[in-house]
Every structure is written in C-alpha cells, then in structure tokens.
C-alpha cells in the first residue's frame, strides 16, 4: 500500500492523529476495480493544509454509453451541486460520464454564485471528456464541507484542468480519489468487489465519506417526497456492467433505502447528501434491464444493496467520537416501513446513544424510543395500528458469538445478569434486537446501524463549523 497519513480534520482541516481502531478499515491494494474508469484526487487549495487532497475527478472512459443514477438529500436547503446534478440527470434521461467532487466547502446556501460555481465545475470537467453530440453536459458534481461559504472557484477550476495529468486507473488513483472526499473522516472509505450474473464477470467499486451530520433520507432525482427529517454523506458507486438508466435508478433507490438511509451518527440530515452510481458497460456483458431479464436485474440489485451496505457501515464506524458500532434490528412489525421508522428512532435517541457510550444496558430507553413512533395505518383496512406491549421482546446480541442476553420477553422483564450485560456492552460491536411480535412477515423487519454519543463528539462539533 502506498504511504499515506490519514487525519481527522478540524474546522480548518488541520491534521490530527487517527484512532487506532480505524486502521483495519483502511483500504488495501486490490485489482478488482471496474474497467473503463480513470480518476484522481489532488490538492486544489480548498483545504488550507498543503498536500491534502480536496478535489476528485472520476471519468468513464468506456466506449459504451454510461448510465447514471442518483439519490439526493430531501433537505429543503438543497445545495447547489445537488440542484445542478439533478438537472443534468433530468435533461440527459439518466446518462452521464463523469463525477467531480470537492471537499472543504459545501457550496450550500450560497445563492446564485453557488449555482454558477457548480455549473462551472460541470463545464470544466466536461472539457476532459470527448464531446457529446447528444448531451450538453455529462458531469455530476458533489461538494462537502462548511455551509454558507463560497467556493474558491478559480482554484477548483485550475485543479480540474490540471487533473488530466494525473488521471489513472490503478489502486493509487482510486485511493487518492477517495481521500479527496474526506472532511472529518479519519480514513478513506473505498471498497471493491467482483460478482457474476449469468456467467459474466463484473466489477463494482465505490467510495464514500461521512463522519458527522449523518442521518440521510435520500430519494431519486426529481421525485422528492419528504418524510421525516434525518458532515454530509457523499458516495459514488461505479460498475463495468451495462445497466439501463431506469433499472440503475430503481436498483440504487432500493439499495440506498436499505443502506445509506439506514444509518445515523447524530440524527442531522445534510444539505448535500448524495449517492451516485455509474454503469459503463466496459465488461461487455449483456444489458441488465428489469423489463427484459428480471432475474439478472434482481441479482444486480442484491449485489448493489450488499455493496452499498458495506460502504454505509464504514460511515458509522468512523462516526465522530464513536466508540461503538451497533446494529439495531426491528422484527415483527406490520410493514418494512414501520420497522424502519422504529429502528431509526432507536438509533437517533440521544438517551439510547449516551447509554451505549456509558456501556449501560438501559433497555427502558429502547422501549421508550420504540413506543414513540406511530405505526402506519393497516394496509388492508386503513385502521390505525398500535404496538401491543405484551408482545414485545428485547435482546442484546454480542458480536463475539457468545450467548445473547434477553432483557424483555413478551412484555415481561427478565432478571438480568448485570455482569453479563456489561460484558456485551463493552464490546465495540453488538446488536439490539427488538421483536414487536405483530407479524411473521419477513417484510416486517428492518436494520439500522448507529454509534454512541461520546464527549469527543461534542468536542469535535464544538470546534468544527459545519
């Protein structure tokens, strides 16, 4: 692996040592990256510290058309790059060949100047691609960092032009591109995998960033339907499979709901949350389309969902000040959405999260959070539904393979072995399992991933202007 120093950045993005627990999440050299992409990460000057990557350029070099999909924040204050990328996708009908990302400045709540700057980034990156006779613009843009400040756009545009000299497809290029996503992250989040569909081998790789201001609630482009509101989460997933634009968007929407929309660090939704997917067909396999080959599409959707889940979990593991990685599973709900809403509420409860930091198996806080979420009306009768407390069970499940610890069974509290409870709570990874006992339907189950609230989280966010 190439030599690199990974830091936790403050409000001025000065270097600080990373925690030792993050070392085993740092990406290792891999040859399983998708074909037909060239990328780089460079220092353009957005961040004050010299040499720290803050600009990433990703190009599809495939001779085949490249489909693109996106899920964006539902925050009312959508940043300029979100609005611009949404417009590019809408005009192109789901085709794009490049992504440009800057870190250190979010270009959010920046008015007309912010929109002009985002479009300037698109046009500068378009210039690195062969001209398209069909599309005016071929680039999607992402930004992350401080809200309410204008981009140093001249530095960024110079960086985009200069990036042409360092574009590559080797591991170092992927690694540098992932580093350029980082703000308060302590390590670059980069993963890749190989998968097969109908005998054809494909590759998928992706990078994301996020450690604070994490509670995404993203939806597909141009179809925002706000639900409850949830530093920014950005992600880009690339594959050399050929996937139709509609199928790529449908698969990404499904995957994001069960991965990035199922994580929380602090319960705050960003203005910039964005996940992009590109499929360039460079592996020369048949087109994956849900209308013509449902089976192949379902395999691809599962691969994408599993991969997105891996990336999303890295964000929680790198949560600002986090000492715990906790899976919250809710089962036996009337619907997936009910289970998801309850798991979300548990995962964002400040009382639950502080108990996790204090290594206190305080299941009363878990129940209180669960019971505060109204269930959706019955899908068959439309009648309101309520949780039956006499059917609810809560169990703590350790990650080390030892015995689970039930603390509530069918509404009746167990005599809890406090020593055993403490053993589980001191683990870095464990699971909170809540069974509502209202349904046996597997669709009534959802998972969420969260972390604890520590003193360090308060210190970081007292120092960092988001």
Swiss-Prot record:
CDD domains: OAT. The alpha and beta chains are autoproteolytically processed from a single precursor protein within the mitochondrion. The active site is at residue 232. It comes from the Eukaryota. Residues 1-9 form a transit peptide. Catalyzes two activities which are involved in the cyclic version of arginine biosynthesis: the synthesis of acetylglutamate from glutamate and acetyl-CoA, and of ornithine by transacetylation between acetylornithine and glutamate. HAMAP family: ArgJ. This is Arginine biosynthesis bifunctional protein ArgJ, mitochondrial. It comes from Laccaria bicolor (strain S238N-H82 / ATCC MYA-4686).
